[in-house]
Amino acid sequence: MERHDIGLTAEQVRRRVAAGAVNIQPQGLTPTAGRIYRKNILTLFNIINLTLALLLIVAGQPQNALFLGVAIVNTTLGIVQELRSKKTLDRLSILNQSAVTAMRDGKAVSLNPGEIVQDDVLLISAGGQIAADAVVLESEGLEVNEALLTGESDNIPKRRGDTVLSGSFSVAGSATVRVTAVGSSSFATALTAEAKKVKEQTSHLMRVLKGIIRVLTMVIVPIGALLFYTQYRAGGDITEALLGAAAAMTGMIPQGLVMLTGVTLTVSAVSLAKRKALVQSLPGIETLARVDVLCLDKTGTITDGTLTFEQTVLMEGYSKEEVSAAVAGLMGALRDDNLTATALRAEFGAARGLSALYTVPFSSARKWSGASIAVQGGPVSYILGAPAFVFPSAEPLPQARLLSEQGYRVLCLARSSVLLRDGTLPDDLSCMALLALSDTVRHDAPDTFRFFAGQGVTLKVISGDDPLTVSHIAAKAGIAGAERAVDMSRVTGDLTFLVEENTVFGRVSPSQKRELIRALKGNGHVTCMTGDGVNDVIAMKEADCGVAMINGSAAARSASDFVLMTSDFSAMIHILNEGRRVINNIECVAALYLLQTIYATLLSLAYIILPYPFPYVPLQMTPVGFLTVGLPSFFLALRRNYHKPRDRFVAGILEHSLPAALTVLFNILILQAAGIMFELGQGEISTMNVFCIGIVAFTLLLRISRPVNIYMGVLLSVLGAAFAALFLLGGGFFALDSLFSRNAFFYLPLAVMTPHLCGLIGGFIRRTGEWWQLNKKR
């Protein structure tokens, strides 16, 4: 076996790579190019479109198969946009990979997790995620948390010979380990993927839209087949029956709606990437827009993650020199690499050459660290930690409380003549001094918190620090209700009411953070947890949405939906706005698509009963669908629209599309009756039908585009001009008769009445719904 201070040689690594003994990593956020092609091409609706187009071509009606071109354009746009987005997101994801340290040829080298090979010797420190199954060779107080694997949040000490599993993360101490399993034989493939996905999330938008698709999938073929049969039986012409069925079925298909929703989410991810916010879960964009409680970790979120040593308060009987020597001795003995240790080493240094008999590294659950050091006259133990945890049975020192009220982070330095054992505090502890450190509030935090509060988002601060200190800093950052603080180390039992009544929660253990999030969710809130430390991971996993900082721990980044690549918390505003833009715009776009779906379904059902040809043929509706749905939907999906979304997503869609669809049905039945009474030709009737459908669609488009800015005004003008040109210049190609005839007496009154009729039907539906809800409550 190789010595662990040397690790593997270059030749040994080469042989293992050749043998495939490499730590294969799970696929990231973005799908492969092949999967993008398959997802966009192999859809049920594309298959239906292709089948109908082939039948029409065989029947000698290739011009009526033009709708297939629209489907191809939609599919191509979706593929191109997703491939471009994949390239951008993959490039940014590389920056977020958590490197590991390995010994190779006697040197410490930095590797990506995918470069680890069997038998590699890795160096593990607090805050890192374990990337491969391994056995401990040497341990200096290593403690790991296996919550991602088992759901249990207790920290587990690991000693020589113990196994550490990929997907767990180190919370205290350090160790040297040898990799025992990689690739398919390791937990790494499955559990690193588990760490990277916060929850099995699905976008609410996608769930709703896929539900609509499922319903359409069940009805579109039976309705189309029945319509074909009744049309054929009524007219006896198989080509005419096929045209009617094709027109109905292509109209019922919401061409590109699900694709456009996915593309919109992906475009938002790219937009956020340009603002240095890495999206690790596309549904998270939408989820954050619906968040009504934002839970903040103090360190690295409210504060910028830097600590400054401020002062030493000596206890009676101890000198400044003794305290300085004790802190320097502790810093030399411990390998803690957190913010507190960094600030103390900068002030007191780290004594080298001391013989550390036993060390207890800091952990967020224990809230203290310590070391037993051999000195003349026997061993001495030094403890450094939160006063309330170092002296749990005593009243808080008055000086400590005073410092906490001033916003300082306070540590208690204590000594004992008893050797430390198994991470338990000695009984003869004596307080030597209080050490005061200060956090720096982020310069952009007050404005960011003010923005969220103005948007109706409640802010909660959840921290492991003293509640008085946290309360002071929260107030300084402008968080309302910061004075309502609670010490969670004294709290047991149900948190349902406690979590609603308070703003600041101090002395919170990692498991309590999770319980607070659960309580908020149990009260009906949509939650977001921000953090940068290992102790935030469990809560971030529990929350509906998690946000981590790039300079935080690897475990926190892996468990989050978003990583702020510059640790600029104001980027949260852009994430919220992107989510709102997606929800609001897709609601508008869905109304356009479902208008077509609803009226095509209603007309299909009507003409299964009526013994007349279907109101239009596919060729006539292809340009109208492109001008009123296909083209404007792409522009609408990407416009700025940052107002707070409504909770009633489906109701919001139907509020627009159902009245418009019923207006289409009314207009076409009136025109059908006029055609029968005045013996109009089918070409005349279908031309008027298509014109009136276009007017209804433009009425809806204008309504959902409000407020109409210059950009939308130009778009609507161009689309309107193209619609007019269709009837003036393109009628022959698209089988449209002239509108300049006596038929104007039929279609013009309906066109003029359309906006008013939509409003009347919409008002009736709304009042009926309100009456229904009122009677339901009674």
Which residue stretches match the model-derived regions?
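Hydrophobic alpha-helical transmembrane segments
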Residues: 59, 63-97, 104, 201-293, ...
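Actuator/coupling domain of P-type ATPases
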Residues: 2-28, 75-76, 84-87, 91-94, ...
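Bilayer-spanning, highly hydrophobic alpha-helical transmembrane segments
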Residues: 46-57, 208-231, 256, 590, ...
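Cytosolic catalytic regions of ATP/NTP-dependent phosphoryl-transfer enzymes
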Residues: 290-431, 437, 450-451, 459-471, ...
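Transmembrane helix-loop-helix hairpins at the membrane interface
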Residues: 23-101, 108, 154, 344
